[in-house]
């Protein structure tokens, strides 16, 4: 009796193993399709209702978002992303989106864009592996439509940004050209495990180490850097990790990363909340919309 049971178990394990291999290869092929087939350029589908020539902003915040993150966008609009003046300096926030195959989501974003006038959109599928396209879209928008901005911050929808403290530090820093700061990553290596979210193949990036770059959760740069990165980007090998791609552009431009403050101010790994502590940080990751609204009170 033991032998038939063992044989049945062996057959089941073989079938299970074969299924795992099949679905793994399917996922990998899907990953490859999403990584490399979508458009890298194109016309803007949506542009924000703003004129930087008449009222040049001190700080433009570019927030990567997706169609389903309406709650996140609304929370940001009510908190740190609200257009206002800090220390006499004007701040403006815009949301970066791609396209979706959902007609309902497309219609909702169309209505949202008409209502708020703060969405930037191009014709590429809005998936994680197109984040470089999304970020470069925002940088292109600054280059073409808002080069008057003194500073630009690229960040994500699940972030707490202390725009008051950031403005204070930028004014103290007094660096208006070739400036780039954030959470510095100076000794990072490509992840070669195929099932990692951050997997990069040898064909996509053949080198064994990344150039210095800042965490994509939030980095800040002087307005002139937007045009420099945009202009050099066509000569830089494309990689789907947007923060690494921007780092490659900075390396080509010989722009060195700098610390914003002697103490840590960017927290891509999150941070336990306290009123006193959050008054002296710039960016904190993993913040849900309801939490953001509570923190802002």
Swiss-Prot record:
The keyword Glycosyltransferase applies. It is an enzyme of class 2 (transferase). Pathway: Protein modification; protein glycosylation. Signal peptide: none annotated. It catalyses: a globoside Gb4Cer (d18:1(4E)) + UDP-alpha-D-galactose = a globoside GalGb4Cer (d18:1(4E)) + UDP + H(+). It is found in: Golgi apparatus membrane. Residues 29-297 are lumenal. Glycans are attached at residues 130, 174, 231. Residues 1-7 are cytoplasmic. One of its GO terms (cellular component) is Golgi membrane. It comes from the Eukaryota. GO terms for molecular function: N-acetyl-beta-D-glucosaminide beta-(1,3)-galactosyltransferase activity. Keywords: Glycoprotein, Glycosyltransferase, Golgi apparatus, Lipid metabolism, Membrane, Signal-anchor, Transferase, Transmembrane, Transmembrane helix. One of its GO terms (biological process) is protein O-linked glycosylation. Catalyzes the transfer of Gal to GlcNAc-based acceptors with a preference for the core3 O-linked glycan GlcNAc(beta1,3)GalNAc structure. Can use glycolipid LC3Cer as an efficient acceptor. Belongs to the glycosyltransferase 31 family. PANTHER family: BETA-1,3-GALACTOSYLTRANSFERASE 5, BETA-1,3-N-ACETYLGLUCOSAMINYLTRANSFERASE. This is Beta-1,3-galactosyltransferase 5. The gene is B3GALT5.
